[in-house]
Amino acid sequence: MAESFEKKRPVLAVVGPTATGKTALGVALAEQFGGEIISADSMQIYKGLDIGTAKVTPEETHGIPHHAVDLLEPDQTFSVADFTALAGTLETDLSARGKLPILVGGTGLYVQSFLYGVRFTAEKAPDGLREQLAAELAEKGPAALYEELKQVDPEAAAAIHPNNQVRVL
């Protein structure tokens, strides 16, 4: 289900809601520290969704490369597992070229899974499992479900706070 890893290279992150100045700050940091941007926005990966996502314009980039933008058609799927794999590849490449990876975006699950070491696989849960676990959560409470997670996947449990019911589920 999840695999954890240890970050060994520096990565900056600029996170927050849409249209709050993340792009401008990310570009300024990239200019100052020799970095490139990795978009952590679940919608900017798609071509043609420029307005609703406040997608960076060519002028706003100031020539700083922006990765993970306009890669897919809107009818293609892209999961957190896909993002962490792509961001990991980009981080390795940028670091090898002496560039500072700067994660910029507002998709919290993308940011958390990448920065805090939980890598999700693309495996689909068996039919009905999520509903079964949600019922168990309602019946037994979050502590019991977290204890079950510790038994099934100790690495994932170590990377997830016991009170984060969404991630525990």
Regions found by a protein language model. Give the residues of each.
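Phosphate/pyrophosphate-binding catalytic cores of soluble transferases and nucleic-acid-acting enzymes
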Residues: 1-169
